[in-house]
Amino acid sequence: MPKPSSPPSAHDVARVAGVSKAAVSRAFTPGASIAEETQNKVFRAAKSLGYRPNLIARSLNKGKSGIVGVIFGGNPRNPFFLTALYALLARLSRAGKHILVFTVDSHANADVHAEDLLKYRVDALLLMATSLSAKLAEQCHDEGVPILFFNRRPPKIKGFSSVAENNSEGGRKIAEHLLSQGYKRLAVVAGSDGSSTARERESGFGAYLTSRGLPAPEREVGHFHREGAVQAARNLLSRKPRPDAIFCVNDYMALAAIEVARYEFGLEIGREIGIAGFDDIDEASWPSFELTTYSVSMESIIDGVAAFLLNTARQKNPLHTVIDGVLKPRRSTQRK
């Protein structure tokens, strides 16, 4: 049985086109200086031979792969994460970066996928709604691969960078707003206990209540999922006395809480039960919800992430960017 022939090389293209190997390289490099006639010769020869340039090998020759590794552990049904992920991929693609995305269960750490991505010689590693062990983080550091956390700051890992919303301030502003509207019995639907994002939002909310001499809010955990939020809202609304306002630490859970309060308990949203969220996803402004929320510009978040990932060679020390937002009061907390 004859051995399969090896794929054509740049040397083969140069020979058929009658040009130098350097000319072949320039022909496939966007923006490189090369005569149009020479480039056309190279393209015709490449097509006839079935040649495709090895972009990864070319990048590695320059010391960088041009690949950003992304490990995504967020709820794929949450519009916040989908919007962020697609916006980021578009931004990095426009900048000429290649993106390799791995998904991981939200309850697992990203070690296995991080090890795989290191084999691809990624220029940087972005973690969205997932975490990494201290051992793997140290391995990334030793191999010169910077780590960036999206909207999360895990306390047990050193040497990482982060871009995050001002989560604690957002929680504080939600609490202040609910009290200003006359709500007195406040509760919270928390996220996952292992999430720094959830902890910071809940902490800011509770700290403001404490500063006003009020007790800690009643609490149920929604795990950032619709099903968890539905059960958490049911549990809270079944208590005696019932809370008159609920802060859900993201909009996705808040929308579920509104539906439970409205359709299962027959409550008028705003007047009989206030519900607030966090993130300002598109659905929050829909007439059927009109959800009060804390809004951080997605463009600002992506700007911060892209600025880091596109300038990894200049990042000598960890950077932590915190992006402020604004409270967006809507009908879901209009009691007066």
Stretches with model-predicted labels:
Residues 73-83, 101-109, 152, 163-173, ...:
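Hinge/beta->alpha junction and helix N-cap segments in small-molecule ligand-binding domains
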Residues 20, 123, 183-185, 215, ...:
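Short acidic/polar active-site loop segments enriched in Thr and Asp
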Residues 13, 24, 42, 68, ...:
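Hydrophobic structural packing positions in well-ordered secondary structure
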Residues 49, 119-121, 181, 236-242, ...:
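Glycine-rich phosphate-binding loop signature in dinucleotide/nucleotide-binding domains
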Residues 1-5, 67-176, 238:
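Alpha-helical recognition/docking segments in bacterial nutrient-uptake
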Residues 1-66:
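N-terminal helix-turn-helix DNA-binding module of bacterial transcription factors
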Residues 217, 234-336:
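Flexible loop/turn connectors
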Residues 16, 21-23, 60-76, 177, ...:
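Short beta-strand segments enriched in small/hydrophobic residues
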